[in-house]
Amino acid sequence: MWRMILVMTVAALGIGGWYAAANYSLEVHRSADGQFQYVRIVPRMPSGSVPSEGAADQPPAAPARPSIRLATFDLDGLDDNRLGNPKVCDSLVRILSRFDVVALQHIRAGNRGLLMRLKDQINATGRCFDFVTCPTLDRDQVEIYNAMLFDATTLEVDHSTVHSVDAPPGTFHVRPLVAEFRVRGPPPSEAFTFMLVNVLVDPRRAPQELDSLADVFRAAGHSGHGEDDIIMLGDFEADLDHFGRLGRVPWLVAAVNGVPTTTRGTRLADNILFDRRATVEYTGRSGVLDMIRELDLTPQEALDVSEHLPVWAEFSSYENGQASHVN
């Protein structure tokens, strides 16, 4: 009898250990100088994605609004040292909290700790922001990743869709990050749903990566999820006239044209792209946030935040919402 109980106990422990290893992982958090801080158990997600902090505790939806604002912001290698600068941190909180979802590029950190601290700083103002991310670096040992930061009261993410683009090694230095969202507030059957493809083009290989992004955009529309509103946004390191094959995708339009998106005002590098036939939810309103003017920063203070400016575009909260003319 005791032998049977012992066997059953060992078997249960073995099955439990296998289940834990298959469904959870240990996330080691370290300080900026590499010192151990703590270990956190996090659930594994499909395609290596990392769940957002509030996935199991969604806040109440905000009242329905006519539109939402999407943005992209290249953080220019944001690390712990820069986030530790009170002026930089305050500026980021003021910028990011203006939007419903922001595609962030070029975060430089060994784990998600930096992104968690940034989210916590925003939420300390009374907001309910969350994020999703997953491994996107294709090569090298430097930890660079992209993420989607969003207001959890106005948007919800389908965690099963969060993944980095599967491409042959060497296609991208930082593989595009993909996630699908739905607006909260309107009835689910009427709410705008969309797929974001967050990109960071390597300036040393811009022509090749831009050509490959044409394939990514086309493939996203045939991913099997049935989503036709594909929005590709990020740092393209080029304007629409120099997009190569990506610029020749039929009906592809850019939210901003002829406007610098760098803090020094020298070039257009960042943008938001979509198919104007499919994404009729675009309201026609978009722009580039001038950090110096909007936040009353000096040129150097703005450069301390990033070499890039946030680019934004507005979309209807409702599926097939009224569209404005796109030039």
Language model feature labels by segment:
Residues W2-N327:
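Divalent cation-coordinating acidic motifs and surrounding scaffolds
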